[in-house]
Amino acid sequence: MKDKRKVLRPLGSGFAMAVPLFIGILVQDPLISSVGAMGAFSYLAFQHRSLFYNLRAILTHGAALLLAFILGAGTALIPWSAPFIIGALSFSAFLLSKVMRIPKPDYFFVLMLYATGFNFHAAHLGEILHHSSYLLYGIAGSLLAGLVISLAEQLPLKEEKTAFQQLSLHEKYSLALSQQPEMVIKALHFSLILFIATYIAYLLRDSNGYWILISAAAVLAGEHMEKIKNRTIGRVLGGIVGLLLGFLLMSLHMPLEAIAVVLIILNILTEFFMPVNYTVANFFTNPQVLLLMTIGTSFMPLKLIPLRFSGALIGSVLAMLLIFLMDWAVKQMEQALGNKPEDTTDHTQ
C-alpha cells in the first residue's frame, strides 16, 4: 500500500496540471494553460488521511495561492512596498504553519505565487483579477484529482477529530511555543532573509529578479542548517542539469499539445523525486518553469536560461549565507549568556 501511495500522489499532481493545460488547448487560450497550471499546485496539500480532509485542504491551499497571486500582482503597482509585504507575509505564514501543524509544502507555494504575481505587470486592479481567475482552472483540476486519488487509495470519507484539532487557536499557539520555544526567532530570521531577497528582486525586477525570492524561499524550507546546505547545493546542481534539459526541450519547437504532455510528465517526476532526492527533483522543476513561460509568449530560450540560473544561484547562496550568519550570532549570544559570571556583590550594605 505504501508503494502504491508513492505512485498515486505524483499521478494526481500530473492529473491536476493536465486539466488547465488541455482546457487551454481546447478553447485556444494559452493563459488558461500557463497561469492555470500554477493553480494546480494547490493539489500538493493532499495527504493520506481522508477524502473530506483532502478536499478541504486543497481548497484552502488554492484560496491561499489565489490571494497570494493577487497580493503580489497588486504589490507590483507599488513595487517599493514588496520587501515589507513579503516580510509580514512570510513571518505570519511561518508561524501559522507551525501553530496549525500544516504539512509540507506548507507556505512555500504561497510565497512562490506571491513572487510570480509580483512579476506580473498589470495596469490596474481589474486586469489583476481577470488574470488571477485563470488559477481557478488549476484549483478545480486539483479538487478533481484529490477526489480521484482519495478514492483510488480507498481513504475514509471522514476522520475523527484528534485532541489537537479540538484545541483553540490560542491553545495551539501555546502548545507550539512550548514545544518549539525558538519558533518566533526562526520566523523573524526567515522573514528578514526574504525581506533582503525581495529587495534584491525589486532592484532586478526588469531581469526576472523574482526568481531570487523563489529560490531563497525554497532553500529556507529546509529550516535546519544541514538541510539548508543540502538544498542549496541541490538547487544549484539540479538547476544546471534542469536548465540544460529545458533548453533541449524548447529547442525542439514542440506544438502546444506536445508541450502539455511533457509538462505533465515532468510534474509527475518532480513530485515523485521531491521527497526522495531534492537534487534530482530539480532536474524536472526547471524545464517545467521554462516551458510554462514559453506558452503564449515570445520568450527565447537563450534569454530565459541565464536569468533563471542567476536567480537560483543568488537566491540560494544568499539565503544559506544569511541563515548561517544568524545561526552563528544566536549561538554566540547563547554562549556568552551561558558563560556570564554570577553577580556575587553584597548589596545588603
Please place each PLM-identified region on the residue numbering.
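Alpha-helical transmembrane segments and their membrane-interface boundaries
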Residues: 1-110, 114-283, 290-349
